[in-house]
Amino acid sequence: MTQKNASSASPLSYKDAGVDIDAGDALIERIKPLAKKTMREGVLAGIGGFGALFEVPKRYKEPVLVSGTDGVGTKLKLAFEWNMHDTVGIDLVAMSVNDVLVQGAEPLFFLDYFACGKLDVDTAAAVVGGVAKGCELSGCALIGGETAEMPGMYPPGEYDLAGFCVGAVEKSKILTGVAIKPGDVVMGLASSGVHSNGFSLVRKCIERAGANAPATLDGKPFKQALMEPTRLYVKNVLAALAAHPIKALAHITGGGLLENIPRVLPEGTAAHLTKGSWPQTELFAWLQKTAGIDDFEMNRTFNNGIGMVVVIDASQAAACAATLRAAGEAVYVIGVIAARGDDAAVLVR
């Protein structure tokens, strides 16, 4: 037997191998006008170069850069199944900019990473359109990103997302929580829904409910209620920070209230939350009933209706709440800071 001469075989292009450079170029052209809408003070060079350039605004005297990175988790599985791709980009931005905000920082710029097995330009453009929308709503520039088409790495129709944010805060205004003391008030800002954590359990609940899943939750179609994008707290909370002496913020993500509030509490303090001090939505009531889990597990898995926590001196709480409500936030006084004994750092009772 003779081996076929490789030189006589048909030539192979990169496209034959599964990577379509033309599709990637087409996507970039669709992204550019979306990114342009997010441009802000400080952007020197954005999408198209080898690296994006950003100058820290001159109004900062002692700027400290704050970075954050995150993804959207298994919420993407529902996006694939339900063909709902236009809001997961907002989720991606929110997960990082809300984290950066917790340090007292203003998000400055954002980069996204979109990975897939085969690039569908329409799907990718819908996703990145959501990223641009999230950046625009946060006052954050979409300054660059990466689209990776990797044949064989992802099943057809699926992709993964990651996001990266950099913000800035005056060194003297970094929120550390060190000034928190017993008697301080704990306020909660309402979430828009499940946000981007707990979706492995959400998907199990959908599977368990099957045809018995409700048509609507909280006045929204079932799928829309579950896919509602993570709330962006940036602009409203930055305004409150400028007007009131907020001591700490906590972004309620994976681990819920029970795992995230302790991250900003100084040693020797605890947060005592009052059960029923904020409304339980139909969405979370359905998840709890369908999963058959207790309140403790709900508060450790989901945000359970509270997406951001604010800790402030009792004398300042009413004024701060009024500022946030005037900006459109639903605000609840959900607890108080106490001296910590032998109990957990967060108690809900």
From Swiss-Prot:
Grouped into one coarse class, the protein's main location is cytoplasm
Q: What is its EC number?
A: 6.3.3.1
The record's listing under Pfam families reads:
AIRS (PF00586), AIRS_C (PF02769)
Q: Which InterPro entries match?
A: PurM-like_C_dom, PurM-like_C_sf, PurM-like_N, PurM-like_N_sf, PurM_cligase
**Gene3D superfamilies recorded:** PurM-like C-terminal domain, PurM-like, N-terminal domain
Q: Which UniProt keywords apply?
A: ATP-binding, Cytoplasm, Ligase, Nucleotide-binding, Purine biosynthesis
Signal sequence residues:
none
Catalytic activity, as annotated: 2-formamido-N(1)-(5-O-phospho-beta-D-ribosyl)acetamidine + ATP = 5-amino-1-(5-phospho-beta-D-ribosyl)imidazole + ADP + phosphate + H(+)
Instruction: Quote the pathway field.
Output: Purine metabolism; IMP biosynthesis via de novo pathway; 5-amino-1-(5-phospho-D-ribosyl)imidazole from N(2)-formyl-N(1)-(5-phospho-D-ribosyl)glycinamide: step 2/2
A single GO cellular-component term from the record reads: cytosol
- CDD domains in alphabetical order: PurM
Protein's name according to its UniProt entry: Phosphoribosylformylglycinamidine cyclo-ligase
Q: Organism classification, top ranks?
A: Bacteria, Pseudomonadati, Pseudomonadota, Betaproteobacteria, Burkholderiales
Q: Which gene encodes it?
A: purM
